[in-house]
Amino acid sequence: MNKLIPVPREFFARDTNVVSTELIGKALYFQGKTAIITETESYIGQNDPACHAARGRTKRTDIMFGPAGFSYVYLIYGMYYCLNFVTEAKGFPAATLIRGVHVILPENLYLNGPGKLCKYLGINISHNKCDLINNNEFFVGDIGLKLPYSTTARIGITKGTDKLWRYVVTDITNLISQYNVQP
């Protein structure tokens, strides 16, 4: 595998949709496990009705207001954790949800769905508000992988369904050939 080069804070401190698209093909490293990000969704500010910060700043959503480059982990349906990365400028609430990955170390495994990937990786509420910068156990790395993706409406929500802010890999042939990952 190519060497993981951690992305800097500036990578996350940009437009959320740009970050969401550029996370496709990046490597998520978490406590000895490495996965290629294959699906993301954007949640942007108080005018996005599906964004947790749509109703303002709360104890739960405080992390979304920055700075960028931190994890935002929360529980849904009382049983599944979701992993997000805080984006944009400090003071503006936004994050990218990581919806799918292809694990490449320690095994080859496709995980579709934010709950599945958090369960497999061992990410839970104790990993909320982790700084992803200068962190040897939890970070995003650039391995130079570019994967084709499509843009669709976000899924699993009831508000803001008109936003085409979901990004999902369309062809993993390159990923499979480089890393022998099975779909």
From Swiss-Prot:
Pfam family for this entry, one: Pur_DNA_glyco
E.C. number: 3.2.2.-
Residues that span the membrane, as ranges: none
One Gene Ontology term from the biological process aspect of the record: base-excision repair
Entries under InterPro entries matching the protein: Formyl_transferase-like_C_sf, MPG, MPG_sf
Record keywords: DNA damage, DNA repair, Hydrolase
Enzyme class: hydrolase
Annotated family: Belongs to the DNA glycosylase MPG family.
Lineage: Bacteria, Pseudomonadati, Pseudomonadota, Alphaproteobacteria, Rickettsiales
Domain of life where this protein originates: Bacteria
Species this chain originates from: Rickettsia conorii (strain ATCC VR-613 / Malish 7)
GO molecular function per UniProt: alkylbase DNA N-glycosylase activity; DNA binding
NCBIfam families, alphabetized: 3mg (TIGR00567), PRK00802.1-4 (NF002004)
Protein name as catalogued: Putative 3-methyladenine DNA glycosylase
DNA damage among keywords: yes
